[in-house]
Amino acid sequence: MFRVLNNDVYSPAVVQQQTTLAFGKASSLCTDNRSANDQCEMGENFRESGQDHVKRPMNAFIVWSRERRRKVALENPQMQNSEISKQPGYEWKRLTDAGKRPFFEEAQRLLAIHQDKYPGYKYRPRRKAKRPQNSLPSVSSILCNQMSVETLHPFTYRDGCAKTTYSPMESQLSRLQSMTSSLLQKEHHSSWTSLGHNRVTMATHIFADFPFYQSLEPRLSCAYFPY
């Protein structure tokens, strides 16, 4: 009986279970200690950053607007914050020099206290982070560039004695219109029995007569010539 109990206690399954439990406790302790250390370090960094930043001393308008804004908010609880912030500015402009004098005196007193507390203080405004500009061009700019490249390469040809300048797109469209009109006229006079055969033969003859068809780009030929 005693041997059986000892075998159960020292069996491989029990030993493995005990080791996994012990390892889990140790890892949890390590993670807890790391989180505590990280929190302490973050707290120290926040304190150091808060100590480095020193607020500017208040001027006369800020001294007056702080008190006045509180009074306006208490008198008008339903007023929005944007309207509450505008109200002290309007009233400050209406005040006379005698009405502004006590607030200027209070601002001078606060400035003297600030200079005694921070003798080497210099105002350094925080710079706003610049947004990264998109280095890749937009799709609309690419399309505009392609259209300008296609339309801004004119060529000249002679028709008798006159010289005329056309862009590639204009010349191709004009020739396509003349070709389609001639096809329609010839097909109108043809018989219904030989309509399919005449369409193919006329198209091949017309395309052979015009050499510019060979210089067309694949995208234009597929778009304008479905045969």
From Swiss-Prot:
Q: Which InterPro entries match?
A: HMG_box_dom (IPR009071), HMG_box_dom_sf (IPR036910), SRY (IPR017253), SRY-related_HMG-box_TF-like (IPR050140)
Q: Where in the cell is it found?
A: Nucleus speckle; Cytoplasm; Nucleus
Alphabetized Gene3D superfamilies for the sequence: High mobility group box domain
**Could you give a single Gene Ontology term from the biological process aspect?**
sex differentiation
Q: Which domain of life is it from?
A: Eukaryota
Residues in the DNA-binding region are 54-122
Its primary localisation, in coarse terms, equals nucleus
* Keywords, comma-separated and alphabetical: Activator, Calmodulin-binding, Cytoplasm, Differentiation, DNA-binding, Nucleus, Repressor, Sexual differentiation, Transcription, Transcription regulation
Alphabetical GO CC annotations of the entry are: cytoplasm; nuclear speck; nucleus
- Single GO molecular function: DNA-binding transcription activator activity, RNA polymerase II-specific
Q: What does this protein do?
A: Transcriptional regulator that controls a genetic switch in male development. It is necessary and sufficient for initiating male sex determination by directing the development of supporting cell precursors (pre-Sertoli cells) as Sertoli rather than granulosa cells. Involved in different aspects of gene regulation including promoter activation or repression. Binds to the DNA consensus sequence 5'-[AT]AACAA[AT]-3'. SRY HMG box recognizes DNA by partial intercalation in the minor groove and promotes DNA bending. Also involved in pre-mRNA splicing.
**How is this protein organized at the quaternary level?**
Interacts with CALM, EP300, HDAC3, KPNB1, ZNF208 isoform KRAB-O, PARP1, SLC9A3R2 and WT1. The interaction with EP300 modulates its DNA-binding activity. The interaction with KPNB1 is sensitive to dissociation by Ran in the GTP-bound form. Interaction with PARP1 impaired its DNA-binding activity.
What family name appears in the similarity comment? Belongs to the SRY family.
Protein name per Swiss-Prot or TrEMBL: Sex-determining region Y protein
Organism, per UniProt? Moschus chrysogaster
Q: Which gene encodes it?
A: SRY
